Each structure stands twice: as C-alpha cells, then as structure tokens.
C-alpha cells in the first residue's frame, strides 16, 4: 500500500500542493498523514503514527526530502524505523531517495545528499550568526527599532519642563508604560 506524508513548518502554510502531488502519484487521500510542525522538532505526532501503522510491504511517499526531515541524523533514523517495519520510502522529486530496492547507489546517494543538505543548513546558520554578530558590533540590534529610542529625548525634555505624564502621553503618542520606562531609563523617575 502507498502511504503519503505531507508536512509544512507553520499553521499558516498550506499542505494542498503536497497532497495534490501525492494523490497524483497514486496515494489514496485517506492514507496521507498531514502535519503542520517544524521538521526540526523531534516529536512529530503524525510521522510517529504513520510509522507505527506501517505494514510490511508498504511504501511511504513524500514529495521531497525536506518534508520528512531537516537533518541527516534524523533522516537516517526515520528511514531505519521505516525499514524496520518492512516498509520502504520514496520521494517524488528526489528520485534517488528510494529504499524499495537494495541498490547500493541509492544508499550511497541518500547518505551523500542528506549530508549536503545538512551542510547547506549549517552554512546558512553560520552566515546568519556572523551577520548578527557584525550588526551588533556596529551597534545594531535585531528586530524593529524601539519607539522609545525615537522619542526618548522628547519625553525627557517635556518631563524636565514640568509636563504631566498624561500630557506627555498625548503629545508623543506613546503609552503610559512606555513613558514611564523612558523616564526610568533616563533616571528621571
């Protein structure tokens, strides 16, 4: 029996494209396990349920490698669990991922390709960390600029001139809590 597995990383993303591909490949829609969770999460309920319910001779169909795993170690572990049930796994896009035969080239390619996939993620992560470190060295912090920084001088000036908090809130458009935080930061309150 063909069994499908479809996964997206967030609730906002749609599984429709993957489900359509799996159905077109010949997987019965009732046999598609669907998940909206990061591939990096170790506990994926639907993946575990699918593997538990596999029967000898079943074939798990995925649209591509990244749908079932984001790390080499995890991928190889999942494949071992599927094989232990007497089942196999095939990828529609990554055609080299096919454990239904004992082809040594498929095993070799699986190991190499999953390793390259892990290398790519590690390089992206490294570049991101380097970029954040570089930005921090230039005095930039991540995220949206704070509203307090834009109007802190105005809040301090108005407070020193004797304006009440209510009036400062009206003039600056900041919340009371933000005005108090700014005054605290400026050591005026």
Swiss-Prot record:
It comes from the Bacteria. One of its GO terms (biological process) is DNA integration. SUPFAM superfamilies: Homeodomain-like (SSF46689), Resolvase-like (SSF53041). Residues 130-151 are annotated as: Disordered. The active site is at 9 (o-(5'-phospho-dna)-serine intermediate). It holds the Pfam family HTH_7. GO terms for molecular function: DNA binding; DNA strand exchange activity. Keywords: DNA integration, DNA recombination, DNA-binding, Plasmid. PROSITE patterns: RECOMBINASES_1, RECOMBINASES_2, RECOMBINASES_3. Residues 165-184 bind DNA. Residues 1-139 form the Resolvase/invertase-type recombinase catalytic domain. The keyword Protein biosynthesis does not apply. The keyword Transcription does not apply. A likely role for the res protein would be to stabilize pIP404 by reducing the number of plasmid multimers resulting from homologous recombination. Belongs to the site-specific recombinase resolvase family. This is Resolvase. It comes from Clostridium perfringens.
